Each structure stands twice: as structure tokens, then as C-alpha cells.
Amino acid sequence: AQIRVVLRGDFMSPDGPIYDSQLYYVDILSEQWRGGTQASCSQIWNSFPDVGGPAPWLTTPDDPSGLYSAVSLYYLAGMLIANGEVDTSSCQDGGLVFGDELTASECGLDVAFSDVVEWQNRFDSDIILVANDTGVPAQLLKNVFSRESQFWPGIYSTYEEAGLGQMTEKGAETILLWNPSFFSQFCPLVLHQSRCDLGYGNITIDEQTMLHGALVTEVDASCPDCPAGIDLEAAHFSVRVFAEGMIANCEQVGRILNNITGKTAGELTSYEDLWRFTLVNYNAGPGCLSKAAKRAFLLGGPLDWLNIAARLEPACKTAIDYVEDISMDLSGVEPTATSWVFVARPLRTPTPRTFPTETPTPTPTITPTYYPGQPTYTATPTPQSYPVETG
């Protein structure tokens, strides 16, 4: 266990009069802690949040109303219009951008705005529940969903990403490899228990690939026969899967930093910056983060966000905007690009779901052209690509 005790009050002049009551701020990091959910990934990183609480984007409100947003989301409006949920016959352009059947025009957004607001808040209760179960900050999850998919939990026709957090098969691989608890729960839904007992790294490549596809299918809420073309039950369930994915990325970030420096992540930088590194890992991949961190370390600079961001290679620098947007209290309206998604391969035809809509979890339990607000894609990390430092 690790304990932090911070004196609170006027203690600057020990020999002089004390005007404040003697107060102590106490934090505990321990796997045996039973006093409530700890700040997510603190145990993995051995890192305490800032005294007084984390930044707003890393908080979890007491109830769903604390996540309420009313952002003009052009892509979400376009999907609602295209799926017949909003009547835009009053718009001369039909409510969509000319030549783009996925993005709402200004008129379309105006007509659809109340539906857009209702839709972007319909997952708030699930986000709060999952955040309380897993410790992944609720505001972080909501901002990621806004940035990735604008809360449209389906799959796109030209890019192999699915769900609220735009998961790829590489992103599925990250969860299954770096979150063993989730692997042990999900694997038996697809493979025989005897195979799952071997662990992710010891099953065959074909079995791993089968699991990747099954997990992407699980978070894909596309449903041609459902209202608005979305299976909302599957969408609600997928919130937990993406939270588990964030935990997997936390684990990978901790390992990357340890391989480079020989120290725990919490010894190197702040809790808030470690979450920024996790978002880089999620969006641009472990190779981008690892190279930047190694360069900063070899140059003797601090491993903080400003220094890591400055050391990102040109192809990785889109992650800076991604991180800066999500680390605002409300995410921006232009979801992000994933650099590793395979384009031009046909997507799977939606098939009847064969997995349970709930994964038993002990305590819980990832874009086309760049019109305003239309999702681009998300780089989800591949564990096999990050370097392992040897002594």
C-alpha cells in the first residue's frame, strides 16, 4: 500500500500563531482498499491524483445530470436525418450537405437540434454507472465518445471502426492482451474455456483473430431492423467495454514508461499527464508514445505532457489536438482520425448477435471526410508494436 498525507492549513510559520485548524488530507493506494472506487489507473501507475481532486475532465459527477451537454454535432444530426428520425423536408437541401449523405447542413442541424441534444445525453446514466464500477472517469468517457463517434454507436461503410469509441480489431487486441480480467470474462463467450485458460498470449493467432472480430462485433450497435438502425441495448453495453479498453491502455502506458526508465509511471509525471499519455496511446498507438517518451528521456527532459508532445513524430502529432480537445470539460465537435485503420476492405455484414448483452464482471465490468463534426478515425494501439527495452 502507498499512503499520502498532506497538511492542510496555515503551517508555513511553525513558530508563529496558527490561524487554521490542523487538517490532514489522506490518500491510500492499495489493492485491499474497500472504501469505494479508487481513481482509475492510480494503482496501475502508482500515482495519486492532484491534492483536492483531479481536473474537471477526469471527474465523475454524482449523477447523470452532471454530464449534460448540448453540443452542435453535425455528423450525429446527419445520421439521425439519414435514418429517418428527423423530418427535414422543410430544408431546401433536404437537411444534408450536398454530396455527403452523412453530414447535416446548417438547416438540417437547426431542425434536428433537439433530437441531437437528447441523443448525446442518452448514454449518460450508463457512463456514470460504468465509471463508478471501473474508476474510469465519466467525463473522460463522454468526451472520448463525442470526439470519436459523436455518440453514434454503429459502424461506418468505409472504415473498420465500430461503436461509441470507434473500436478497430487492433483496439480489440489491446483490450484482450492488456486487460486479463476482461479477457477471462469475454473469451469463454467465443472459445472453449480450456483454450481461454491458456491466456491470450498462448492461444493460436487464428483464435486471437476470432476474438478480435467478436469483440468489434459486440460493440457494433448497427441493426438494420431497429429504430434509427441502432441496437440501443448493445450500445449501452458497449460503454463498459470501452471503459475496460481505457484500463488496458493505462496498463500499456505504465509498461512503456517502465521499460524506458526502469521506474513506475507515478514516479515520472503527474496523474493528469499519465491520462494524456493514455489518450495518445489510444489514438495514435504505442509506437508514437514510446518513441516520444524515449527521445525525451534520452535528452534528459521531464516526462511531462509538454515535453512528450514536443517529441512526437510528425505522423503522430494529430494526437496533440485529440488530447487537448478531450481534456477540455466538454469535447469538441470534430471527432478524430485514426491513422491505422484499413480502408477498402469490405466490412462484415451485420449478423444476429450471438453473445450475451452483458459480460459478467466482478466490479464493473473505441471517419470519413472532414466536414464540421464528422468522425474521422481512431488509432487504437497494437501491443505487439511497442518496443520492450532490455537492460
Would you name each region that the model predicts?
Residues 1-210, 216, 220-226, 240, ...:
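Cell-wall glycan-active module
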Residues 227-237:
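A short, structured beta-strand-centered segment in the mid-to-C-terminal lobe
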